């Protein structure tokens, strides 16, 4: 399957095909010098598969985790290109998750004012969200994505076969972003998650429309948008009511949920990409509509910054040894190497909850719990509020946020970091 992101001269294809990693040389122009960037948490064979298809590959493995989105690593990659005498006719390829894509994309955007960039995402989060849209960035001063550029890839290759090496927690981390898309823009996709959460399984296609219906829904206008004073409109399609999972059977029900979701992963990725594709085509540089993709991210980034300061970079991702141990394991294995700290998608899951209307929140929380995502967390509310003030969505006039009044709907509003801080008790663990 090929989806085209229609951006005029910057248009590009998203290739969704099992096994396309081995076809990278045929699908991308790699007959030149290529900087292949991956990280220590990605099975090295993925990057080597790409490198073997290049005329001249320079493979660099950075440390896994947010610490690699730094000025130092950014400079090291640029220096590698200088020393290898890369020209503007050469290119950069990212093979990894969102961190690798952000870093490598910004390197491509910066070297000689821009060289070709190809993105090959290897995590669910990157496949459903961060690999398309052109956002590239590194962190600065302890805050996420403070330095970056909008720089579109030449092509994105999505190979679902690479997901077989991911532990379940990494799958859940990515599915949080798919739930985000569903909440604001795709009631049928939310219905898929809700049915799985309620029953632990469903028949093929239950709660989902056809591929054509997915395209129609997206083309009709992603989600149901409104500004703070406007009325919202709904997409076609409805989601069924959820049944709260029995806490005593939470582990076994989570197993059932993932067993049910796994055959539908391609559908989840496709529908999420259709939502984001439509948004990016309408608002490439986040002047308006694209802000809906930040749903859950303002509070989520605040929690994430707090977590990184609290636990340190040793917990910024799974260890290389844990990743290698998971390499031969089946998809949806139960554990990974992180013992403390939250992943980005887990923080987004928390960040969505306070910004949903109460009836939406009542339906969202069972879905998040069924996926194994957090719905509460212990944190210092004042520290999280302070981090929100440094979020890139903050300005002198306040903080732009997305709220969810109803499934498949959204509003864009202005508020303050202090007002968001007042919402934090909804996700803050109560002291014993």
Feature map (PLM): residue ranges:
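Residue-level signal for inorganic ion chemistry
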Residues: 17, 36, 70, 121, ...
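Active-site segments that bind and position negatively charged phosphate/pyrophosphate groups
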Residues: 200-205, 252-383
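Short glycine/serine/threonine-rich phosphate/pyrophosphate-binding segments
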Residues: 99-106, 127-128, 301-302
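ATP/NTP phosphate-donor binding region
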Residues: 1-91
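C-terminal charged capping/lid subdomain of soluble metabolic enzymes
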Residues: 11, 176-179, 361-432
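Non-catalytic interfacial helical region
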Residues: 78-95, 104-119
